[in-house]
Amino acid sequence: MNVIDVSKLKYRKNVGMVLINAKGHIFAGKRIDNNTDAWQMPQGGIDEGETPETAAFRELSEETGIHFSRARLIGATAGWLSYDIPVELIPQLWNGQFRGQKQKWFAFEFLGKDSDINIATEEPEFSEWAWKSKNDLLSSIVPFKVEVYQKVFLELGHLVK
């Protein structure tokens, strides 16, 4: 059995998106690749040469199917937030290259209708979606993301009604 030296692994740079509807609820998707009842906000990697803000718009569109014109950027975390994944997941994710993710979070006001959302995208990440309150979302995510979500809501929560 190989023992992973987590201290030698880096964090994967990533963006996260808080999509907020007119009622102040947050878009959450149920992970398609997870057998548990794990929900999360959209997030994804930053491509080579891409700014975090550009990546956020692209990932939001890729994961929710909404057009850029249906989301208005209204805030961002001041810095980067990171989380570690459980050691047993490291070999399964990102070819075992990373210990977790280092994320810049962006808040978007959703300007569209629910019918504008289409999670049946080219490479779907979610099997279903829902609008959730902060508390509902915090109670339905994987435990290792709770702390980073709390930090996101500490910085951007004032944008959620």
Listing of model-derived features with the role each one plays in the protein:
Residues 1-22, 96:
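Acidic, metal-coordinating catalytic segment for phosphate/diphosphate chemistry
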Residues 30, 141, 153:
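Short, flexible helix/strand-to-coil boundary loops that buttress conserved ligand/catalytic motifs
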Residues 11, 52, 145, 149:
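Hydrophobic (often cysteine-bearing) scaffold residues that line and stabilize catalytic clefts
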Residues 102-112, 116-148:
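NUDIX/MutT-family hydrolases
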Residues 16-18, 25-26, 105-107:
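Residues embedded in well-ordered beta-strands
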Residues 154-161:
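Generic C-terminal helix-cap and adjacent flexible tail
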Residues 21, 25-68, 74:
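Conserved Nudix-box catalytic region and its N-terminal flanking loop in Nudix hydrolases
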Residues 77-116, 130:
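Active-site-adjacent beta-strand/loop module that shapes the phosphate/pyrophosphate-binding cleft
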